[in-house]
Amino acid sequence: MLTGQFLTPLMSGFVITVIFMPLFIGYLRFKKEGQTIRDEGPKWHAKKNGTPTMGGLVFIVAAVISSIWVAIWLQQLTNSLWIALFILVLYGLLGFSDDFIKVFKKQNLGLRAWQKLAGQILGGAVFLAVYFHEGFSHALNIPLIGTISSSWFFSLFVIVWLVGFSNAVNLADGIDGLVAGLAIVSFATYTIIAFRQNRIDVAIFGLTIIGGLIGFLIFNHKPAQIFMGDVGSLALGGALAAMSILLHREFSLLLIGLVYVIETASVMLQVASFKLFHKRIFKMSPIHHHFEMSGWSEWRIDISFWVFSIICSAIYLLIF
């Protein structure tokens, strides 16, 4: 892939996002529709009440359009790319439904947990159907254990992976700019892996998302003009999991996406500790809120988490 071909999907995702994001923000402000901040969060988040949300819709559309036209141009419109786009769109639609109920229907809890889970599992099932139809390998290389070649085990794993990481990224999306920056690092890492494997189709997918996220971050850094919403975070988590599966580097996500894992673990530990011992381990969970409650600025948390993610990704790329 030549330099111009490398820059094209990146710039396409970026330009489309930068052009249409201000229009989307303007529309939501005109309609006076924005995020309702829950009382359970840090008190100073109340000033963010009414901030436009669902910005993920714009960078998802940018990624889909860019991926398809660039893939056609480079003759890389493969089924791997289609199923990656399918997960991005379906999980984005789930998040959009959740956001729509919260923002336009004024029901702050959104979709019920079982509805969201059912949609995520359905998406995973369709992903698997196409995956197996194409004859892709269902051998799963588990570190320190070995290879398991069972279609049933692989299917269960894929469902858990897609559902787990879409929700993990969603949990991490709690302060301005955090997930956008983390996702840029994660997708960049998998794009490098895709180039190493000569998987140009998957690399195109990653590059268009990175471009869209860079464009989005212009409007999402503190003080955020717009949030990505569940439409963005659920889609990004599902897309990351899909890339790791398509590149047969599934467990790499535990290191490359270690921040998401820690965010999720902090919530689980907090809930378990409170239920069992009536004590809280953290001042607030997910853990980025713990640092907020400890006096860290959002910008300091962003930079610290981004740098940590870069280090984790660099370690993986250097070792593996």
UniProtKB/Swiss-Prot annotation:
Its main location: membrane. Pathway: Cell wall biogenesis; peptidoglycan biosynthesis. The chain crosses the membrane at residues 6-26, 54-74, 81-101, 117-137, 145-165, 175-195, 200-220, 226-246, 251-271, 300-320. Pfam families: Glycos_transf_4 (PF00953), MraY_sig1 (PF10555). The keyword Cytoplasm does not apply. It comes from the Bacteria. It is found in: Cell membrane. GO terms for biological process: cell division; cell wall organization; peptidoglycan biosynthetic process; regulation of cell shape. Keywords: Cell cycle, Cell division, Cell membrane, Cell shape, Cell wall biogenesis/degradation, Magnesium, Membrane, Metal-binding, Peptidoglycan synthesis, Transferase, Transmembrane, Transmembrane helix. One of its GO terms (molecular function) is phospho-N-acetylmuramoyl-pentapeptide-transferase activity. It is an enzyme of class 2 (transferase). It is a multi-pass membrane protein. Disulfide bonds: none annotated. PROSITE patterns: MRAY_1, MRAY_2. Its EC number is 2.7.8.13. One of its GO terms (cellular component) is plasma membrane. It catalyses: UDP-N-acetyl-alpha-D-muramoyl-L-alanyl-gamma-D-glutamyl-L-lysyl-D-alanyl-D-alanine + di-trans,octa-cis-undecaprenyl phosphate = Mur2Ac(oyl-L-Ala-gamma-D-Glu-L-Lys-D-Ala-D-Ala)-di-trans,octa-cis-undecaprenyl diphosphate + UMP. Its cofactor is Mg(2+). Catalyzes the initial step of the lipid cycle reactions in the biosynthesis of the cell wall peptidoglycan: transfers peptidoglycan precursor phospho-MurNAc-pentapeptide from UDP-MurNAc-pentapeptide onto the lipid carrier undecaprenyl phosphate, yielding undecaprenyl-pyrophosphoryl-MurNAc-pentapeptide, known as lipid I. Belongs to the glycosyltransferase 4 family. MraY subfamily. NCBIfam families: mraY. This is Phospho-N-acetylmuramoyl-pentapeptide-transferase.
